[in-house]
Swiss-Prot record:
Pfam families: AAA, Lon_C, Lon_lid, LON_substr_bdg. Belongs to the peptidase S16 family. It is found in: Mitochondrion matrix. HAMAP family: lonm_euk. Residues 80-103 have a biased composition (Basic and acidic residues). Residues 895-1082 form the Lon proteolytic domain. This is Lon protease homolog, mitochondrial. GO terms for molecular function: ATP binding; ATP hydrolysis activity; ATP-dependent peptidase activity; sequence-specific DNA binding; serine-type endopeptidase activity; single-stranded DNA binding. Residues 8-144 are annotated as: Disordered. It comes from Cryptococcus neoformans var. neoformans serotype D (strain B-3501A) (Filobasidiella neoformans). It is an enzyme of class 3 (hydrolase). The lineage of its organism: Eukaryota, Fungi, Dikarya, Basidiomycota, Agaricomycotina. PROSITE patterns: LON_N (PS51787), LON_PROTEOLYTIC (PS51786). Disulfide bonds: none annotated.
Amino acid sequence: MLPLRAFARLAQRPRLSRPTQLARSSLPRPSPSRPAAHYLALAPAPSTRFLHSSPPVLKEKRWLNNTPPEDDGEDGQNPKQDDQVEKPLPDAESSKSAEERAKSQSSKPDIKASSSDSVSSSAPAPGSADGGSPPGAGGPKEVAKPVIPEIYPQVLAIPITHRPLFPGFYKAVTVRSPPVIKAIRELQAHGQPYVGAFLLKDSTVDSDVVTDINQVQPVGVFCQITSCFTSQEGEGKPEALTAVLFPHRRIKINELVKSSGTKGDGTVGVGGLVEGSQDSAKGEGEVKSFESEVPGVEEVREELGTVSIDSEQPDVHKENRDLETKEVTQIDFLHSLLPQVSLTNVSNLSTEPYEKDSQVIRAIMSELISVFKEIAQLQPMFREQVTSFAISNTSSQVFDEPDKLADLAAVVSTADVSDLQAVLSSTSIEDRLQRALVLLKKELINAQLQFKISRDVDTKIQKRQREYYLMEQLKGIKKELGMESDGKDKLVEGFKEKASKLAMPEGVRKVFDEELNKLVHLEPAASEFNVTRNYIDWLTQVPWGVHTPENYNISHAIKILDEDHYGLKDVKDRILEFMAIGKLRGSVEGKILCLVGPPGVGKTSIGKSIAKALGRQFFRFSVGGLTDVAEIKGHRRTYIGAMPGKPIQALKKVATENPLILIDEVDKISKAYNGDPASALLEMLDPEQNKSFLDHYLDVPIDLSKVLFVCTANVLETIPGPLLDRMEVLEVSGYVSAEKMNIAERYLSPQAKVAAGLEDVNIELEPGAIEALIRYYCRESGVRNLKKHIDKIYRKAAFKIVTDLGESGLPEPATPPAENQVEAQYPDIKPASELTSNVIPGTEVSGVDTKTDVTTVPREPMKVPAGIHVKVTQENLKDYVGPPLYHKDRLYTHSPPAGVSTGLGYLGNGSGAVMPVEINSMPGKGNLQLTGKLGEVIRESAQIAMSWVKSNAYLLGITKSEAEATLNDRDVHLHMPEGGIGKEGPSAGTAILTAFVSLFTKTRVDPDIAMTGEISLLGQVLPVGGLKEKILAAHRAGIKKLIVPAGCKPDIDENVPESVKGGIEFVFVEDVRQVLHEAFRGTEVEKRWQETLPMEEEPQRERH
């Protein structure tokens, strides 16, 4: 035990200096508005504020190691500083003499202060002055560094989030709980600025108090509070306290201290004796082990030398010797705040013993240092941090001591919280180094990727900046030399030059001048500049007054039309009439033609031939499925990406006012919420309105009257009436077999031969094979399916030739290596093998095939040896196109049963078919059942026929008297075969009526007789359509007699070729009596009908 004069000697020693400028500048200053921000402090640790106060003095028989830190206006403030007033020692005389003796001892020249007793740590110990002379010191004497208590059994627990703390690295935490703030200030006021920092397991929890030990990680750090300052996070919010913590060592939490009492062993820590209760302070007390508890006592003993302290102060020493000893913890004064603060009993977490010279540890340390260097080379920020840490006082120890090196690696990494906590909790140095190495390796991979991305971005930016800088220099040079004007001036001049070559109407010229004047006064960076520029560009792209000279040579037009298309007499005659009028008048107005016909008959291709014959430009666009009116009328200029409609786009592309515009699939226009495109076509196709067509984008009248519009459609029923009224309809019927034969021989076969690469090979496609294709494979009215089959034949022939000759007959051409060819023509292109040379290790490169060969040399066509001959006949046709699709043309060829008749139908694909009608009866209640996927109209035709038969049952001989009920006890079932094909239309009326009569009179109908026509309820036969296709189907099926309505005779004479009508007798009837007499001619019932159901006149007949 030391006498009181020793403490008096300590009281005369100079106070510790403030932190050096380096420490104060290296520590990041927390922002009051950003609480608890995690940051690293690799610079030397600043001195603690609580050690700046005076040495300990006895206050009311209590020892205080420190006083609250002084407020320097920078690091913090102490609300209790004004209350801490030092009281004089009880024995003023002894205190004064002790001070004088201490001064005399300190002035002796042989007594030297030494800092060799200071304790080193992983970072400068808070409170050290780095050997600097304290203010007011009389000489170069150094101040000893304080010793951090090695044993501190009870601490105030501060929960932290996001990242754990590591020994030797600062962190600022923000506390918002008023009791915890009060506890921290009490710790500073009593000279015990030590807390324990533990990481919360749940990062979403924001609390300053630990209520359960399982809320935090079991391993934390023992920290010293270096400075505190208050901050206001917002208006109306409570005041917060930001404390800067400096961790010293790892600790392990044992238990929480409850509010009922203090838990622990009750021993006094190394920090010194602190007051307990008020009664014990007034009672007896004794200082225990003061030499090891109060910093600086050993140094005082050194300075006193051999001076006998006991002899100089015998009374005081004797007085204190009798004080009673009472041991308490360092933070007993915080127990009154429980449970509003969390006090924990902790123990130091010791590192397992290890050999520093272990080969494994040294190898891992070397690898860590290497990774540090690699990251420092890639990331300048990381390099600055490591450099800043390297200038600290103890930086040389970090790379020599494994535990500190592992902690440094964990601090600088951005790993997960669990990985960082694992490094902190590890007690094995080797395991800790291994975990730190994994974290640092991940940082290296991230740094490499970041470096690569940064390098790529820099390269692009530098290239653009260089180009921009050179372009600006070039503009300046050209401007000085007068070689080129400003870009906007050049643009304006270009527009003026374009407009000068166009015959703009007066109104359009005025709009152009206004927009051009606006463009001149706009800055190129303005958003409206591009809008105005695009508008003027479209105005100058419209071919105002520019037209193509038309060719009205009739013979030339006939030659062009016949070369491209076979048949289509009506369409060709209409075009020739159009040209004849133009030749007489010298000019023609635009017309609107509508070509209606089944698919594949050449409606679209005939439009191209018409344009070619007239010498006009051709433009095609389809409106099938179109729902947006803006596609026709254009968009408003206010929209981004706005543009004119299709008519204006067509004029821009063809650059003439009189092109031929083909509007395809006009019968398939859709409707939507944003308008009806069919109605928008009215203005464009109306000859009275399209002279001043108004586009939404241009908003100036456009003359479309010189445009020849040709529309195509499959049916007329879906075209709106007002639109159909503005068009001249030309029906394009299907091709008959003879026409298909000519088209295949003259057009399809030569085209397919060239497409297959067999133009120089002797390939013979016999007419019999083509006829078999048409009869058994391609019965459609068009030739599109026929073209597909002919293409297939030539493809099979090409494959057969190559297979038969083999590789020896057709060798591959010898070419140099493809990669060398590319390198010779494009030296900047690198081989694929070099594309992965700069790839970062550990990454995958996709899309790079090192074996891919590329070339720019075109491949020469191969020569087929002469003498190769392929012949396609009707017999071997199935080897090329497979088995036939159609086998029988008629279901009944010989003696059909009663109740069967033969009708003619028009299929949806534009072809005709022979369709038998079958009727049977059974006992029932007089119901009529219809099957065969029949439509509504054909069902009505069956009901009409049934009603006519019932009303004329006596005349037909079905009943014996007119009053006899007919078929009330019989059910009738009507069926039309091929139920998978839908059937609709009124043209089966005569065939159904004939089948009813055949069933009820039990008389068969000749199978070589077919019929078509609609019947009325009173027995009249009405005309129907599709006669050409129906007659073609009858001709193909071998029908010898056709019963057709008399109203269809002009259509048959005009549109049906003689080749189709050959061998068929046509009977033109007007009522059902003529139909029945002709269908049952020569039978017994027909002879009886001559009296009961006579014909008014004989039907007209024609035999071909």
